[in-house]
Amino acid sequence: MLRFGIKTWKRSVLAIRRSSTAPHVQIISNLQKKLLNELYSLRRLVDDNSPATIRVGNVSLLLSKSNIRRRIALQALSSSAEDVACVKQITHALLAAPFMPESKELKYAMDHNGLNPLYISFGTNALFERNARYSTSHLFLPSDFLQVNNLEIIHLPPGTVDSDILASCHARYICSTSYLRMTSSDFTTADTLVLDIDPKLHSLLKNEKSIIPVSSSAALKATKALQDDPHNFQNYQNQWEQSGFQQLRTNMTPTSDLEICKRFLNYLCCSFSLTKAEKDLVRATEFSNSMLISIEKWAKYCDVDLQEFEKKLQKFWKNFGTLKLYSNIESLPASLKQLIKDEYLQKSKLELSFILGELSKNGDDKNNFELAMKDFGTFQNSRMSAVDQALQPLRRKTLYTTAFQGLGALGSLYLYFVSHFSLYNAFSVFSVCGVFGLYYLQSSYRSWKKEYWKELLEEGRKFERQLCRNVFGRSSFYVQQKTAAEKKEHISLIMKKLTKTLDLMKEFQLQSSFSDSPTASKKQLL
């Protein structure tokens, strides 16, 4: 009876525990869904080809997969024999471990590695075996090589670009004869792993605290010493510890999935810092402001003596010193200098088009200046045609006035000779007709001149505004300022998403720690 009571009590306790933990598990599941949604929106915000997208994809993978592959990509910096040998040397060093004989399969695969990536997996995993892409150039090795289950090293030939490979790698190493640069492994620090091959690098290692010596040659030497003398394990152990290779091995095996996720997200926060975007925006604004100030200063030199023009121009740009566009005016073509003197300084206020065009050459758009000059040439041609068209009614009115004066003169002569008027009366009639004709001509000329200059001024101002708009719109300064402002707004939105995701991560970790069996919960949910 006592045994029956104990069993009944155990069932009751288990039932109460299940009923009490069920809502908690549901909370954790909901938090996981929210996290995945936030990460999905982050992936849509960032550029598809940027490393940030790869990292966001990795975070989503870490939260959605229960069995995670540790993947490391090794790639030569160039196709030189030294860099390729460097990759092979590092691969052999990664595979070096106590009491492990040299793998003939690995040696054959490394020697015959061609254009395709070489995959080296540790341990047996059904995921590897089911994947068709690993049917070729894939090597399975025992899991006790690095004492890490589910580890995979990818040997990439130079120039290999495979987003699928890199998207699922925890670390990617660009290998050269003198250094091994780790682009994404420990996301809290930016470490550069240097091979102890070049003696010149010792001074660099002393001054830079962020550089970790790997000494893969020492690791290989220790392994070779152990193979030559299997009984002298102490010698191997000393050389292995001196090589510092165990530290690299430890860094490649993160502790927990949640820690990896937090590292990813914290690294994203550092990557999407608003500091760079704000600096770009301020720099672009300063460039644009200095551009406008230089134009205003330039306009003050329109009435200078033409003989002193080149000297003052050189002095102006030398004192201004920011853009240094006309630091050597003698390098300008003679036709351009003459055009500046004759057309723009003497006859027109549109010398600003030259400055706008030249300033735009400070950017990448070299055709901007030519386009501005084409626009100005088109405007000059249209202005000349406008003058011709405006002169047509004046010519007609002048012809009418001349005809009116002629008729008056003929009438006065007719009256004098036929009607025997006095010469005084005839001259009076002629004078009256002439005065009326001149008055008509003068009034029409004034109205025409007023209307013509008004139209010409409006047309000139309209063209200048359009020219400035076109040149500024094509200018790299304007584009840079606009891009920086958009980038700042975009990064601000990403930072808000990241902050929200990190808050969800903290809550997720907190709720997971409250469960009865955190390990089981993580295994179930992750």
Curated annotation (Swiss-Prot):
Cited Pfam families: Mmc1_C
Cross-referenced InterPro entries: Mmc1_C
Any one of the GO BP annotations: chromosome segregation
Residue ranges of the TM segments: 398-418, 421-441
Domain of life: Eukaryota
Annotated membrane topology: Multi-pass membrane protein
An annotated GO cellular component: mitochondrial crista junction
Locations listed in the record: Mitochondrion membrane
Main location per the UniProt record: mitochondrion
Entry keyword Thylakoid: no
Keywords of this entry: Chromosome partition, Meiosis, Membrane, Mitochondrion, Sporulation, Transit peptide, Transmembrane, Transmembrane helix
General function of this protein: Required for correct meiotic chromosome segregation. Appears to also have role in sporulation.
Identification of the protein by name: Meiotically up-regulated gene 99 protein, mitochondrial
Organism: Schizosaccharomyces pombe (strain 972 / ATCC 24843)
Phylogenetic placement of the source organism: Eukaryota, Fungi, Dikarya, Ascomycota, Taphrinomycotina
